[in-house]
């Protein structure tokens, strides 16, 4: 074995790429390290293309092994199972920038597997995974227009920080990941605390500039370790067939794409395509129908893009910067804690908000450590939203990714646990879709949270921008349709407040997207965002003054931390009885904070009363109403508070001489007693006669 190793400094870490030792039967395998975080990236491609497919079959699998963090998996089977949400999101993060770098027409199946085998708790594995993937593809011989670089950018004390540690990210107002080639930015994923557009654009530029060291290092690594490039050539188009299809379908396609209603437009486009295909088959029964379908798709793209770039109205008749008609409703469902219906053109989201207690929070145990997520946002995309049938079940990668993007958009304005001690779950049901459903989810979430009485800092709106670029000419599109996303060159999603950006996601399919274009897109997005916020604020401009009557009300009290064990009781008996008998949910913190949750106010009051009794300190000189629980020769023991008993000595029962305690007291008798003393050992001395004397005096 002859290892080939390339190391370079990258920000505050050393990155090492190694090949030639592990997984040598794969087309390429790279062991990539950043500090002590190490991933094994393998690439395998099939040498024979599957021409029956009309798409590029690329699969990216990212898997975190618990042994990487020195842990044993939980659960019965004690082994890793289905991908977690974090693993799914990182797989998408890797997939998005590499997919455009494979050549058009390449249909060979390619699988990339990234396995995290060692993890430093201060260095997240996503950036080194992207770098390792780029290196593995570069040396594999598979046609790939890399290398690709990747960087994480933080913003701390008004300065950009390259690849910040986990601790640094905790104090950063920005968490941005950017990936690109030597010449172009291809992908951006970020979360921010309402930062200005120029700061966000500066972070993208900074990250792309800094990652050039990665691109150069991988190029050198490829020169030493790269395999010969596959002998692959792009399929040659039959120009006569291209011309014939244009003759048969261009006019009909142009007319169809002036129909504003999506489903009607799709029907007409289908008719035009079917007629053209039928005419071609009638003329030549041996024509390759798959190639015909591909060329019809290319013509469709050319028609739509040509109209936009020439200054003609968009598919639905809008100008480039126009937003579709908005309909905003809050409080649309009677029993949910909060709800909204947000409609933008033919995209619609029904969003609900549910409030719960701290125990309802999501507990996540990953290789980066344990964490608790109080705010959850789930996005569902049922097939009926686009007029189709399909499988319904567990969320797909796209649904997980869109939900996380909407979560990032809202996270900056969420209240702290001290401000609002609830767990919050938002669900966005996409009931109609024609572009930008994730940004509709952001708008709907903001409305539903306000309807639920969640004190978010301000409203948040989201907008999806697009781009059509031909040569030096380009048009930036606001509020793109699904077709404009599919047929355009850029998908640029921006969420934020009036003050700044909270989330930015960008996927670029071509090179040549300049800083000028991105700046125009950001400024145009700002105008669109403010317009949407104005409409949203007319429906509900601030959070409700109170939470729903159907939501649990959380009341917080403080007790002496030393009394926590008294509230819990032996084996949890006391707190179990409290929750069962009052119908409340009770949570205890080590610092003495007690949270009582119930939708019934009287039940909450009863629980508080009983907790206060349990934790109350016995006061010397105070008179208590107690119950006799034990009689002995020298006196009686009386319970004055839950778990608090005291002794009434025989001499303290009456002013008269008492010969037999049982002649004066009996079991379970209620008596008034005065606390005379609490000694150092906590023993309580009580007096009945002193209590009677005080009552007589009063």
UniProtKB/Swiss-Prot annotation:
SMART domains: KH, S1
Pfam families linked: KH_1, PNPase, RNase_PH, RNase_PH_C, S1
GO molecular function, one term: 3'-5'-RNA exonuclease activity
Residue span, S1 motif domain: 621-689
E.C. number(s) listed in UniProt: 2.7.7.8
Annotated binding of Mg(2+), by residue: 485, 491
InterPro entries named among the record's database cross-references: ExoRNase_PH_dom1, ExoRNase_PH_dom2, ExoRNase_PH_dom2_sf, KH_dom, KH_dom_type_1, KH_dom_type_1_sf, NA-bd_OB-fold, PNPase
EC top class named in words: transferase
GO cellular component, one term: cytosol
Subunit composition and interactions: Component of the RNA degradosome, which is a multiprotein complex involved in RNA processing and mRNA degradation.
Protein family membership: Belongs to the polyribonucleotide nucleotidyltransferase family.
Primary role: Involved in mRNA degradation. Catalyzes the phosphorolysis of single-stranded polyribonucleotides processively in the 3'- to 5'-direction.
Protein's name in the database: Polyribonucleotide nucleotidyltransferase
Organism: Shewanella frigidimarina (strain NCIMB 400)
């Amino acid at each position: 074995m002859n290892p080939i190793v390339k190391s370079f400094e990258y920000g505050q870490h050393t990155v090492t790429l190694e090949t030639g030792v592990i997984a040598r039967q794969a087309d390429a395998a790279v062991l990539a390290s950043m500090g002590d975080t190490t991933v094994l990236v393998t690439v395998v491609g099939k040498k024979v293309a599957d021409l029956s497919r009309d798409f590029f079959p690329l699969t990216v699998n990212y898997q975190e092994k618990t042994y990487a963090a020195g842990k044993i998996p939980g659960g019965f089977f004690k082994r890793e199972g289905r991908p977690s949400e974090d693993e799914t999101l990182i797989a998408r993060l890797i997939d998005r920038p590499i997919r455009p770098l494979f050549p058009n027409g390449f249909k060979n199946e390619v699988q990339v597997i990234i396995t995290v085998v060692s993890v430093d708790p201060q260095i997240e594995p996503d950036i080194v995974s992207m770098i390792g993937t780029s290196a593995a593809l570069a040396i594999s011989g598979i046609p790939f227009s890399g290398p690709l670089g990747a960087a994480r950018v933080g913003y701390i004390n008004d300065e950009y920080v390259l690849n910040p540690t986990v601790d640094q990210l905790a104090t950063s107002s920005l968490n941005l990941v950017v990936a690109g080639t030597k010449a172009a930015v291809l992908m951006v994923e970020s979360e921010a605390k309402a930062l200005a557009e120029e700061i966000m654009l500066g972070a993208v530029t900074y990250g792309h500039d800094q990652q050039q060291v990665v691109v150069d290092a991988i190029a050198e690594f490829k020169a030493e370790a790269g395999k010969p490039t596959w002998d692959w050539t792009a399929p040659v188009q039959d120009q006569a067939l291209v011309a014939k299809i244009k003759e048969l379908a261009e006019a009909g396609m142009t007319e169809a794409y002036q129909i504003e209603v999506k489903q009607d437009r799709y029907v007409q486009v289908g008719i035009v395509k079917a007629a053209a295909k039928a005419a071609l088959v009638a003329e030549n029964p041996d024509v390759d129908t798959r190639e015909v379908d591909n060329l019809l798709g290319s013509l469709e793209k050319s028609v739509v893009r040509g109209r936009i770039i020439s200054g003609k109205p968009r598919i639905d008749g809008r100008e480039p910067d126009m937003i579709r008609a908005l309909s905003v409703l809050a409080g649309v469902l009677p029993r949910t804690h909060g709800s909204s219906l947000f409609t933008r053109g033919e995209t619609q989201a029904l969003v609900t908000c549910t409030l719960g207690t701290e125990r309802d929070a999501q507990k996540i145990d990953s290789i980066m450590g344990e964490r608790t997520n109080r705010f959850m946002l789930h996005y569902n995309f049922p097939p009926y939203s686009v007029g189709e049938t399909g499988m319904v079940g567990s969320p797909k990668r796209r649904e997980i990714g869109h939900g996380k993007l909407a979560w990032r958009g809202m996270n900056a304005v969420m209240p702290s646990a001290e401000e609002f001690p609830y767990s919050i779950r938002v669900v966005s049901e996409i009931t109609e879709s024609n572009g930008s459903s994730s940004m509709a989810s952001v708008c709907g979430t903001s409305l539903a949270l306000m309807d639920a009485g969640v004190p978010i800092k301000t409203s948040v709106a989201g907008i999806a921008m697009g781009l059509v670029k031909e040569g030096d000419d380009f048009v930036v599109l606001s509020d793109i349709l699904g077709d404009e996303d599919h047929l355009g060159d850029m998908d640029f999603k921006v969420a934020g407040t009036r003050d700044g950006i909270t989330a930015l996601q960008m996927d670029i399919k071509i090179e040549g997207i300049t800083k000028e274009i991105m700046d125009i897109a950001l400024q145009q997005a700002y105008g669109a965002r403010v317009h949407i916020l104005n409409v949203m604020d007319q429906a509900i401009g601030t959070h409700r003054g109170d939470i729903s009557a159907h939501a649990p009300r959380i009341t917080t009290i403080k007790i002496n931390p030393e009394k926590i064990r008294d509230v819990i009781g032996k084996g949890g008996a006391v707190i179990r009885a409290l929750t069962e008998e009052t119908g409340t949910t009770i949570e205890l913190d080590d610092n003495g904070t007690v949270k009582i949750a119930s939708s019934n106010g009287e039940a909450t009051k009863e629980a508080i009363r009983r907790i206060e009794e349990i934790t109350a300190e016995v006061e010397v000189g105070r008179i208590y109403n107690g119950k006799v629980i034990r009689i002995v020769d020298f006196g009686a023991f009386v319970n004055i508070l839950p778990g608090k008993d005291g002794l009434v000595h025989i001499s303290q029962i009456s002013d008269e001489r008492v010969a037999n305690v049982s002649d004066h007291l009996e079991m379970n008798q209620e008596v008034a007693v005065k606390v005379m003393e609490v000694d150092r050992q906590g023993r309580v001395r009580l007096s009945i006669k002193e209590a009677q004397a005080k009552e007589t005096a009063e």
